[in-house]
Amino acid sequence: MQFQGAFTALVTPFRNGEVDEERYRALVEWQIEQGINGLVPCGTTGESATLTHQEHKDVIRICVEQVKGRVPVLAGAGSNNTREAVELTRYAKQAGADGALLITPYYNKPTQEGLYQHFKAIAAEVPMPFIVYNVPSRTGTNLCPETLARMKRDIPEVIGVKEATGNLIQVSEIIEYCGADFQVLSGDDFTVLPLLAVGGCGVISVSSNVVPAKMSELCRAFFEGDLATARRVHYEIASINRAMFLETNPIPVKTALSMMGRIELELRLPMVPLQPANQSRLRDILSAAGIV
């Protein structure tokens, strides 16, 4: 399975404390209409940390049902509890997801050997394509390129990484050690174009919740060799990328989507609404970009 191009890390819309299935299905449709290359339910942007297990499963199921095979679905299924990660990954496979996005265990801060054994154990229970998610700013642990290379060698299910350090030296080492067939996706919207330039294959994006066509255009232009267009789009969406991180993700992106009329603005604690000053800044940025 090739996960290439622009994938959106979908928000999970809520209404009155429950998953808003109608708005979620509409978001999936809009993303596909806008030319997105793939979708990721139940990632960080989807507030997976505050979904119940049943909601987590429901969101994956709804996404797969609505996509109907038109684009790949890479389902968030990670946990810092290996047994729980096995359960969620098994459900993702049963629901028909094309692959699983598995975050490195967080809070318990395993060693590199512990990280290796975690993913090996999941693969032994649920053989399906995995993209490992490395985001040290949230997990407190960095998955080293050498460990990824060992996983790639020993665990066939590990076919790539979502690399969110923003560190192009580390990205380059991953590609050097793992080879060109290892799928390296940006987990940092600011460095999509540089990551593609050193051999990456795409992005799992927050910003593409708001500008799916632009993020898809950036990736497509790069792969078609149209570097001028890729560079132009990179700078066109720079202000959007900054806006999506005015406060902790997914607070700004859900606020933006509510301003666009696509979802109700509802977050789950401990996420709280965007500060008023940042709401004004966000609206100004979206207005300048012609989005609202």
UniProtKB/Swiss-Prot annotation:
Could you say which residues are annotated as the site Part of a proton relay during catalysis? T44, Y107
Q: What InterPro entries does UniProt report for this protein, alphabetically?
A: Aldolase_TIM, DapA, DapA-like, Schiff_base-form_aldolases_AS, Schiff_base-form_aldolases_CS
Q: Which SMART domains match?
A: DHDPS
Where the protein is mainly located, per its record?
A: cytoplasm
Query: Could you provide one GO biological process annotation from this protein's UniProt record?
Result: diaminopimelate biosynthetic process
What pathway does this protein act in? Amino-acid biosynthesis; L-lysine biosynthesis via DAP pathway; (S)-tetrahydrodipicolinate from L-aspartate: step 3/4
The cross-references to Gene3D superfamilies, in alphabetical order and at most eight, read: Aldolase class I
UniProt KW keywords: Amino-acid biosynthesis, Cytoplasm, Diaminopimelate biosynthesis, Lyase, Lysine biosynthesis, Schiff base
GO molecular function terms noted in the UniProt entry: 4-hydroxy-tetrahydrodipicolinate synthase activity
What residues make up the catalytic site?
A: Y133 (proton donor/acceptor), K162 (schiff-base intermediate with substrate)
Name one matching Pfam family: DHDPS
A cellular component annotation (GO) from this entry: cytosol
- Entry keyword annotation includes Amino-acid biosynthesis: yes
Query: At which positions is pyruvate bound?
Result: T45, I204
Enzyme class label: lyase
Cross-referenced NCBIfam families, in alphabetical order? Answer: dapA
Its job: Catalyzes the condensation of (S)-aspartate-beta-semialdehyde [(S)-ASA] and pyruvate to 4-hydroxy-tetrahydrodipicolinate (HTPA).
Subunit comment for this entry? Homotetramer; dimer of dimers.
State what protein this is by name: 4-hydroxy-tetrahydrodipicolinate synthase
What species is this protein from? Nitratidesulfovibrio vulgaris (strain DSM 19637 / Miyazaki F)
